[in-house]
């Protein structure tokens, strides 16, 4: 009897356990690969992905960004993991706010998308110090990204922390989560041969792969830009503007493009880079023509370098990147829509592309036809790599005209469904509109307060003293942009000198006996510069205070962490009229990081702190000054920016949230690419090949993003500015980002769409002409006007958010030679 009960109970328990295991397995996804593609749940898949970096937006923005990515035809979201954001101090972690990475991945999962986890933990990304914490420099024996125990111990500790967080939240595919790939290290192959220690570099990269695989994440590990000395247990991948001619280092693994650069980052002294929708589509189409399987746009949404996160040095606060979604999350048209059309066509051919046999036929040096066949179906690509001429290509008896630098895709090898150079999507021009809050005054009313510099005008009360000029990052652990170097000397009688300081900057302010006597900053990418200023010493003790400031730390290159910053080594000299120098380099220097108001956290407006502001005449061009104003949040849901034109350089906060560094006084350089734009030919971000640049000769960044979640509706919001270099706040204003003009074009038989989006309606149709030859969207001129087209679009579109009109032969005007109709409307 007891035996039967025991046996029955055992069978019941086993059955319950089986059910529990089965229930736990529901939704679990297997991920493997072969030479054609990733294999997800036993099915070969083409994956279209886009990079969205969670710290470069806010949690409130994430669902909308991810939704738009999915609606744009993407399957996956790719992101780096930002080590120095998550571990700003050793073993002190931050996973809150826009660093809540688990929440970000859950948003991806909720949208029904896959995710690609790029741990690094070195990431480059134009992020401060490439994502590596500055405190690593404090650890004895530390060598970044080489085979040494101090670095590898810290790297493994952080990697394991991130992996365990993802496992605990069931984020990996085998747990039912969205993560289908994980990356270790980043672009190591670009620097591996430049480290002067090939053995250590090789041992390190193989250690990385072994360490990663021991994490048992259940999905493949990848390494990007690792074409040589590739560990056997990772998949190497490509980064670049074009990856069609690249193939992995061995057979049996798929062709993956982890970074297709949709534009380029911006530096304070450079104009805005624009990569055309035609060229990106051309690159993507060629990649899949030549056996590509997974392609990721870097970036799909660039976002904002809030706080002190921008790298470089000299990377701007905006990380817009000319991505399909702009810095604020708006659709960048026609780039977003043109790529969406491409994605739809590629997905319609997925089975044929990943299973079919393929045949390449060359029609000369720059023309290739690729045919994929599977059973009775076929799909074809025709590419024309000539950048200066259109060509006719005959395929299966039919002739197809290909514009220069384009790819045509024929899902049935008969009819062209997509050509990379022929854009059907509208163009949208976004504008900055004045604040429309009901109670908002015409201009902001300011109070101001000087930064308290007096504690730093002597060489007393420092953190420590040293008889040498030290490197800034090591000394400050990058806890502030600012580091004070202070010393004193006794002088007999009065004397006139020239103060000479050699520094690796990035900025320098010099004070003698409490007075600002000179300032300078590095220019043209050369971060070694000199400050020379006349100075008078008085009889007795004289104080010299030098304030060195950084503008983002270097994030890329071999041994980039060894690039010195600050007045390291100097020399610092006082030179008299005869050329005789007093060398102060080995004097007793007192060091202190940061400014007084940083220590008091004035930006947080804490209850115990009283703002001792002056409400009288507002000083302008006064360095080291705080300005404060309140404003009503702009009405509606449009993105908000603050226009800081008139200011020089500093930092801005809204309601205690750091918007980032500002520097609108820095003018973008004039470059040859500012005056020409042609999608044809290989895109370059450097050298003679640059083109399609805008903003030359203008403020490098005038507008700064204020996310809606930073604002309080219906109550006063606080804007706080720290003006470091001296500017004029009188023109500062809040604005909203709205569609200004929308434009489209087409020929007879085409159905074209105009959409303002975001709840905005078309207010007028301004142009409806054939053969428009001058201007850009928002400023088109000329052409042969069509009254019939104007009336049709006015009737269909005005007062509506979106409208679609078919172009008919009835629109053609008498004597109009062109068959292409251009329509421009105002939102």
Curated annotation (Swiss-Prot):
Coiled coil: none annotated. Its EC number is 3.2.1.23. Residues 746-827 form the SUEL-type lectin domain. One of its GO terms (molecular function) is beta-galactosidase activity. The active site is at residues 187, 259. PROSITE patterns: GLYCOSYL_HYDROL_F35, SUEL_LECTIN. One of its GO terms (biological process) is plant-type cell wall modification. InterPro entries: BetaGal_gal-bd, Galactose-bd-like_sf, GHD, Gly_Hdrlase_35_cat, Glyco_hydro_35_CS, Glycoside_Hdrlase_35, Glycoside_hydrolase_SF, Lectin_gal-bd_dom. GO terms for cellular component: apoplast; plant-type cell wall; vacuole. It comes from Oryza sativa subsp. japonica. SUPFAM superfamilies: (Trans)glycosidases, Galactose-binding domain-like. Glycans are attached at residues 198, 249, 260, 366, 392, 502, 520, 578, 586, 615. Belongs to the glycosyl hydrolase 35 family. It is found in: Secreted, Extracellular space, Apoplast. The keyword Transmembrane does not apply. This is Beta-galactosidase 1.
